[in-house]
């Protein structure tokens, strides 16, 4: 399916590029930049391959119209987080809330992903926001 192929080409590394540009002094961004310096070509190839698999999973959720509140979608977010933890930096509750706030206020993330794959631009930010509030509700 051509649409899913396009979605596979949207890698988490692209979101990382946006994040590192917007928050160059963030402690996690600094940590990730240090880790990235040591990656070999093989590491990069593996990271991209894993990101493609992740995006294929997310694309299937969109095609199947799976709501962000569904356990399959929540699993998609967990895969997203695991990818970041493995390749960039640890993701904790504070970071998830920061990412949720950033994606809800700054629409350039949604627009960026939407250009890459129809539906992904709205789905991923909504999924991040849902997961953040699942961890810590507004009134908690």
Predicted stretch roles:
Residues 1-140:
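Amphipathic alpha-helical "stalk" segments
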